[in-house]
């Protein structure tokens, strides 16, 4: 057992060590006045004036229009798959509702998949549509965070920078170099990178077996660096071609956490308040460790119903013990629990086990992290979501002591709190609203593999995953229906843009305000006390908002499991 905790500690130490240089590089990308030659070529090709400055309205409009154009392009490619080359299996085009769902999924950095990649998409579609939108979605989140940080850093300013400059820089300086290096490591470890759609092998019994291949390593690298999560294969990171060795599993985990953790350091560096960045990092780390401990202990404890049936769930020299249903033996409980906590903390959605097979308490962890949506979070957007809670914390503290709240030298007034609450409320309204609609929709029961509280959890998980732009699933739900493709697609769009746009408006409002020096009545935010308050507000606000739905799903399922009740 102690080896497991040493492994967890080592991973977290590596993440912390990598966050510093990565954060410094991100801050340099966001603040540098120099443009590389390839960036200047990109500006000329796009017709962009890099010296132009954009207010929050134009910054947000550029974000929306670029994402909208890429969504339409992705949709067109998915609908035209039958005419594209490199389609050795002759895969047909996706249906209109599935193509909408897939395009919305990947452009919003969600990567929800209502299809199985290796049997539904051609290699051309995987490269030109899917991998392209993986880059687009990840870069958009980081760029939005850059604009938001500038809003806090600037005083009496009218702009948040230039969206196109930020986009091009993040592409050429961050995403492409990192993805290229990681892809080479994956190829070295045995991840395929080929244009052949299939090879045939002869098994030990003499039978002929078809093995599907493709450009897996290039997709796999941006999948985790960009907190995307969509798999080339339906089994995702549980497939040996996506995750063949312990080293690739560790790189997957560190890749998911790299940019989200580094964004807190970049935030502190750009504001010249590095202690503030470490406080935000510490808040994320505290929540992450708590959720990791919960999912590990829940899964290692096993299922009492199986124990009553005579199954041996104890750790021994020949088995890892615990609840091994839906898990890879090569990963066991420890690496599976770490992956579960990481993929939903960083809103990646990649999986190396079936979340639907977790114990009720273990399954509550990914649900809760997606509902909170700021335990490190996705590339860029995780920091934005955390900062909205930080501003809310300052506001609540200011109200308790009877002073106008301030955050980083900016007064937080009625307009700012209204914008924060718009962003905060958009998330639960989407999750709970669509879940309620699905609960009364006549065809929902036909899509459920389970009845009772777990069936409800499958639906709740789908909309929490879509709205949080996570993409993982309780796979007992058949989501490839017109109803689920449409509503989950809308949930992904709502979760992305109905939170980003109010926060960009907030950044514009704060940028226009002068920065005032801290006074004797200013509530300090770069302290362990504020970190504790921030964690408290995140957990309480998230808990109170979603507690009734969690009580109907995993909580009651856990109680029934402990009492020996099962559903047919």
UniProtKB/Swiss-Prot annotation:
It comes from the Bacteria. Keywords: Cell inner membrane, Cell membrane, Ion transport, Membrane, Potassium, Potassium transport, Transmembrane, Transmembrane helix, Transport. Its main location: membrane. The chain crosses the membrane at residues 1-21, 60-80, 129-149, 174-194, 251-271, 278-298, 381-401, 420-440, 488-508, 528-548. It is found in: Cell inner membrane. GO terms for cellular component: plasma membrane. The keyword Cell membrane applies. It is a multi-pass membrane protein. GO terms for molecular function: P-type potassium transmembrane transporter activity; potassium ion binding. The keyword Transit peptide does not apply. The system is composed of three essential subunits: KdpA, KdpB and KdpC. Part of the high-affinity ATP-driven potassium transport (or Kdp) system, which catalyzes the hydrolysis of ATP coupled with the electrogenic transport of potassium into the cytoplasm. This subunit binds the periplasmic potassium ions and delivers the ions to the membrane domain of KdpB through an intramembrane tunnel. Belongs to the KdpA family. This is Potassium-transporting ATPase potassium-binding subunit. It comes from Delftia acidovorans (strain DSM 14801 / SPH-1). The gene is kdpA.
């Amino acid at each position: 057992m102690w080896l497991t905790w040493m492994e967890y500690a080592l991973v977290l130490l590596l993440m912390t060590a990598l966050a510093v240089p990565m954060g410094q590089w991100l801050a340099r990308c966001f603040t540098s006045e120099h443009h590389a030659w390839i960036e200047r070529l990109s500006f000329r090709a796009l017709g962009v004036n890099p010296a132009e400055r954009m207010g929050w309205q134009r910054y947000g409009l550029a974000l929306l229009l670029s994402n909208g154009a890429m969504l339409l392009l992705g949709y067109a490619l998915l609908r035209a798959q039958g005419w594209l080359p490199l389609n050795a299996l002759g895969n047909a085009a996706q249906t209109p509702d599935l193509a909408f769902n897939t395009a919305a999924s990947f452009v919003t950095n969600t990567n929800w998949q209502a299809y199985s990649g290796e049997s539904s998409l051609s290699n051309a579609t995987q490269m030109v549509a899917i991998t392209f939108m993986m880059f687009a979605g990840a870069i958009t989140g980081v760029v939005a965070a850059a604009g938001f940080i500038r809003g806090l850093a600037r005083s009496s300013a009218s702009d948040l920078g230039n969206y196109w400059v930020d986009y091009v820089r993040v592409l050429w300086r961050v995403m492409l170099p990192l993805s290229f290096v990681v892809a080479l490591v994956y190829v070295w470890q045995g991840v395929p990178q080929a244009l052949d759609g299939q090879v045939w092998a002869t098994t030990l019994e003499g039978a002929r077996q078809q093995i599907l291949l493709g450009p897996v390593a290039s997709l796999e690298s941006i999948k985790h660096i960009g907190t995307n999560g969509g798999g080339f294969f339906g089994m995702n990171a549980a497939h040996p071609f996506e995750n063949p060795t312990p080293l690739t599993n560790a790189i997957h985990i560190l890749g998911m956490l790299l940019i989200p953790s580094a964004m807190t350091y970049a935030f502190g560096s750009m504001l010249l308040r590095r202690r503030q960045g470490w406080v935000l990092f510490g808040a994320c780390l505290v929540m992450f460790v708590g959720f990791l401990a919960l999912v590990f202990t829940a899964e290692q404890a096993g299922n009492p119903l199986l124990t009553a049936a005579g199954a041996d769930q104890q750790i021994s020299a020949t088995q890892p013990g615990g609840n091994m249903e839906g898990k890879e033996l090569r990963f066991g409980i420890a690496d599976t629990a770490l992956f579960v906590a990481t993929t939903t903390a960083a809103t990646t959605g990649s999986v190396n086990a079936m979340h639907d097979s977790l114990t009720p308490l273990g399954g509550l962890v990914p649900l809760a992290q997606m509902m909170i949506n700021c335990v490190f979070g996705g590339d860029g957007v995780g920091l934005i979501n955390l900062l909205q809670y930080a501003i809310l914390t300052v506001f609540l503290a200011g109200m308790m002591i009877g002073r106008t709240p301030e955050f980083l030298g900016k007064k937080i007034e009625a307009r700012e709190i209204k914008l924060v609450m718009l962003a905060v409320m958009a998330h639960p309204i989407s999750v709970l609203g669509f879940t309620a609609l699905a609960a009364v929709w006549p065809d929902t029961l036909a899509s459920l593999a389970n009845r009772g509280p777990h069936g409800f959890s499958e639906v709740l998980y789908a909309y929490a995953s879509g709205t949080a732009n996570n993409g993982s699933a309780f796979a007992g739900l058949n989501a490839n229906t017109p109803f689920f493709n449409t509503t989950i697609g809308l949930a992904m769009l709502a979760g992305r843009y109905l939170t980003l746009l109010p926060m960009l408006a907030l950044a514009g409002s704060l940028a226009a305000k002068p920065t005032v020096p801290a006074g004797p009545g200013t509530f300090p935010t770069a302290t362990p006390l504020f970190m504790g308050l921030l964690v408290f507000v995140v957990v309480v606000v998230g808990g109170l908002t979603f507690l009734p739905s969690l009580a109907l799903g995993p909580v009651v399922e856990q109680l029934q499991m402990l009492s020996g009740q099962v559903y047919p």
